[in-house]
Amino acid sequence: KDEIIDAGIDGKKGGGKKDTQDAGESNKGKEKDKDINAGSKGSGVPRLQKITKKMNLPMVKGSMVLDLDHLIEYKPDQTKLFNTRATDAQFATWYEGVKAEYELSDDQMGVIMNPFMVWCIENGTSPDINGVWVMMDGDEQVEYPLKPMVENAKPTLRQIMHHFSDAAEAYIEMRCASGPYMPRYGLLRNLRDKNLARYAFDFYEVNAKTSDRAREAVSGEKAAALSNVTNKLFGLDGNVATISEDTERHTARDVNQNMHTLLGMGAPQ
């Protein structure tokens, strides 16, 4: 009779037990993994809050009026907050107004904005400018009226042109790289250092990245430009007339029209 062979048992008696013992002996040499205690704490470095509620903060009826979480995350672009720069909405209104009066497309306006920025670098952005501005088409001068540029600029043309400050600075650097170049604004201010040519335009926007020497140069340029300027609040009122009657009577012997005779004395020398 054929014997029934179990495939799970070693052919030799006791073979399966021996394998189990060998596996146990091989595991004795290994260290048991340590369990990690989820409740344990390391020596963490304390972090201080940048703005705490213990500061003297503005309060109304015992409630703080600031949202500290929002204040910590509020880090806007500094130049966007300057009141010396036109807002984005004011700049867009100026752009659309100029485009409508010149009757140009957006692509054509892109060509116009380049030479107008260069013209302002050379001639400034004074509110008193009038007439025409000029761009070059090869060797030919092409004239455009300044009226749309100035009248649509709110609050002022200089505040509008502050949006072009970085582009103008990069343009001057490009011109200086190809040869000696100093904007006319710098020539009028007698700026002698060619390395400061990139700051020699009147709509340069001073920011946190501007070096101390450059800020000094910009301040000196503005002071020199405004040294002889006098602004009068009121001009001559042409609607005011003298209504009083002058009843003074003078003779030929009087000293002058405002002084009677001095009884033989001559006029004071």
Swiss-Prot record:
Superkingdom: Viruses
Region Disordered, annotated ranges: 1-45
Species of origin: Passionfruit woodiness virus (strain Mild) (PWV)
One Pfam family cited in the UniProt record for this chain: Poty_coat
Biased composition (Basic and acidic residues): 9-36
PTM field: Genome polyprotein of potyviruses undergoes post-translational proteolytic processing by the main proteinase NIa-pro resulting in the production of at least ten individual proteins. The P1 proteinase and the HC-pro cleave only their respective C-termini autocatalytically. 6K1 is essential for proper proteolytic separation of P3 from CI.
Family: Belongs to the potyviridae genome polyprotein family.
Entry GO CC: viral capsid
Alphabetical UniProt keywords: Capsid protein, Virion
Official protein name in the record: Genome polyprotein
